[in-house]
């Protein structure tokens, strides 16, 4: 009976053991899939906007949740502010000393690493996108700077630095990125919006997007959506897809987008000073009266050829605006625009037949600074108020403006802004009205710095565009996890069945053993002695069975 009891205990133990294994397996499988599906992986990205006057760092992070929605990217926040840092001068100044380019970016890389978990850094892409400043330097200098960054930057940071992520971007892509950023910030890509944009596919419901004008130091960009049925054909028409699936038209957009290289405010000043120099040569003098500076402000200008002259401010803003207009619409224009075959923007750029006065437009960078920092008129655009305030400001003596600045009456403006405000306000308004034909009275234009409390930068749009495939990667991974989990669930029933069969087998063996190993009294009742039984066991060749049972006993 002792052997039988052992077999019974063994069977019960086996059943409990197998049941525990199956339960643990089931719980672990459920826990794994829940952790993967509920706690999505957070990813990071770094982008440097290498502009004409400096380079700015932006650090973003995101959690992709669905391949049917646009990737949700946000700036990394530290101390209630987005992580951002600007260094000067611009990257283009290293054209003559390219070996120092990577070291110049070291402070930005070090700051980014402080806000990215160490284990995430090798998988964090770094984008170095240079804009107008780098476009203007000689080709050999461009290549030397880029080569240094591609070679040396991986030695400075543990983040992911790829050769193709360090480049000079075309001006139109700067415009596309800005367009993406502003519409993303406004929620125009959300599926919850229902109004159809004219010309989109039947039944395709999405919000009407807005246009944008970004006025930088060296260039200006414009971008707005065209209806699908618009037949305007130009190299400035770009089709983009922000979704992670190429066959999904929901996030596909047709844009008019172009850049005006050399028409940023700082390049505008250079153009203006060249015209002043030309006038001065006709007068054989060294000092010229300048309507685009406050009264009695003096500025010495050194031209590229080494010639010097002095600008002396007269503070006549209306005359300044008229002079600036001539810079946008020179007498020499393209034959297409002269023949009026097509509508054209300034710089003889053919334009679609869409009145921008009727398009909701947002102005960035200098459109905000030049209306807000000194004039205090940022926001909804009012041409009359801007002209009036500009005329009042520029008509002041420079000494009066300096005194007001010392009293903190211009808290948002440094001295350089105060000196150039007259020209810049004339430039941005002339570009808007004379360059893009936006009506001065009836328009939907506004200048902005932030949207929904967030500073809008084209860097955000660039990150959204280049990381758009992340949701597809994560959804594919989750699908594999689910399929694996489903397959494992199908094994539970066979495991239970096999465990039951095994336990039953052990019980049967135990029962058989108990019948063979009964006591002497029962054997005697059958007319058997221990000796006879033992002899018969040997005679019937039950040795192997005995050995088998002895192993279990």
From Swiss-Prot:
Enzyme class, UniProt record, top EC level: hydrolase
Cytoplasmic side: 1-8, 511-553
GO biological process entries: ADP catabolic process; cell differentiation; CTP metabolic process; GDP catabolic process; gonad morphogenesis; gonadal mesoderm development; positive regulation of protein glycosylation; regulation of cell migration
Localization annotation: Golgi apparatus membrane
Superkingdom per UniProt: Eukaryota
EC identifiers of the protein: 3.6.1.6
Stretches in topological domain Lumenal: 30-489
Primary residence: Golgi
Glycan-bearing residues: 190, 284
One GO term describing the cellular component: membrane
Active site residues per record: 174
Single Gene Ontology MF annotation: UDP phosphatase activity
Keywords: Developmental protein, Differentiation, Glycoprotein, Golgi apparatus, Gonadal differentiation, Hydrolase, Membrane, Transmembrane, Transmembrane helix
PROSITE patterns: GDA1_CD39_NTPASE (PS01238)
Pfam families attached to this UniProt entry: GDA1_CD39 (PF01150)
Function: Seems to be able to hydrolyze ADP, UDP and GDP. Supports mig-17 glycosylation and surface expression, which is required for proper migration of distal tip cells during gonad morphogenesis.
Name of the protein: Nucleoside-diphosphatase mig-23
Lineage: Eukaryota, Metazoa, Ecdysozoa, Nematoda, Chromadorea
